[in-house]
Amino acid sequence: MKAVVLTLAVLFLTGSQARHFWQQDDPQSPWDRVKDFATVYVDAIKDSGRDYVAQFEASALGKHLNLKLLDNWDSLGSTFTKVREQLGPVTQEFWDNLEKETEALRQEMSKDLEEVKKKVQPYLDDFQNKWQEEMETYRQKMAPLGAEFREGARQKVQELQEKLSPLAEELRDRLRAHVEALRQHVAPYSDDLRQRMAARFEALKEGGGSLAEYQAKAQEQLKALGEKAKPALEDLRQGLLPVLENLKVSILAAIDEASKKLNAQ
């Protein structure tokens, strides 16, 4: 199981190169991708959750209970933001160390990816050119039919559709043929890349010393991350206590008020 975790970590780190396999822009670091995703995800949850709380407080029941959930939500959001800022340097250090420890393996895998990319690129360029040629040919064949449609009456619509149908089918068949040709050209290189990756990890697994070393370093980094995260998590717990207590008091007060009104009736 530890080997699987380590393998996934290495794949994730090499993903900063693999995700740009067909692209020309500079790759984003693993930490930047994780940080961006986490920030967007947490902010989305926080914003949507706040909207629900605001809607509830604006309702008749929310006004009657007067739980002040929105104040508690904002306080809770501030606490989470503080904890996230505290954990930022810790998780950054963890990713930096993990990247450093797997540098050699990632370089080998990136080299394999680049080699396959160079072999496949001519087929991709040829496919793109053929695709554009087919679309241009189709556009030229469509031009006179479009003029005929604009000049013709409604009763000619059916006739125009009958003329367009063979052209569309011809384009579809030709594009399918190009896609199939590309698939056949690229398939051997995809299989080769898959075999290379499998061989890399098999060699890592069979080399007991290397694998044990990677596992030990990964465990050490995870342990260090856990130790450094403890203060921030404790701050989170302390920040949650007054929020939960305030919410508890508000709910009990609302229940008590409701009970008194029922008894008075």
Swiss-Prot record:
Which tissues is this protein detected in according to the database? Answer: Major protein of plasma HDL, also found in chylomicrons. Synthesized predominantly in the intestine and the liver.
Q: Which Gene Ontology cellular-component terms appear in the entry?
A: chylomicron; extracellular space; extracellular vesicle; high-density lipoprotein particle; low-density lipoprotein particle; very-low-density lipoprotein particle
GO MF entries: cholesterol transfer activity; phosphatidylcholine-sterol O-acyltransferase activator activity; phospholipid binding; protein homodimerization activity
The UniProt entry lists the main location of this chain as secreted
Which Pfam families does the UniProt record give?
Answer: Apolipoprotein (PF01442)
Q: Positions of the sequence repeats?
A: 67-88, 89-110, 111-121, 122-142, 144-165, 166-187, 188-209, 210-230, 231-241, 242-265
Q: Which residues form the signal peptide?
A: 1-18
Q: Which residues carry this modification: Methionine sulfoxide?
A: 109, 135
> Any idea which UniProt keywords this protein has?
Cholesterol metabolism, Glycoprotein, HDL, Lipid metabolism, Lipid transport, Lipoprotein, Oxidation, Palmitate, Phosphoprotein, Repeat, Secreted, Signal, Steroid metabolism, Sterol metabolism, Transport
Q: Where is this region: 10 X approximate tandem repeats?
A: 67-265
- Give the record's family classification: Belongs to the apolipoprotein A1/A4/E family.
Q: How does it assemble?
A: Homodimer. Interacts with APOA1BP and CLU. Component of a sperm activating protein complex (SPAP), consisting of APOA1, an immunoglobulin heavy chain, an immunoglobulin light chain and albumin. Interacts with NDRG1. Interacts with SCGB3A2. Interacts with NAXE and YJEFN3.
Physiological role:
Participates in the reverse transport of cholesterol from tissues to the liver for excretion by promoting cholesterol efflux from tissues and by acting as a cofactor for the lecithin cholesterol acyltransferase (LCAT). As part of the SPAP complex, activates spermatozoa motility.
**Name under which the protein is recorded:** Apolipoprotein A-I
Organism, scientific name: Sus scrofa
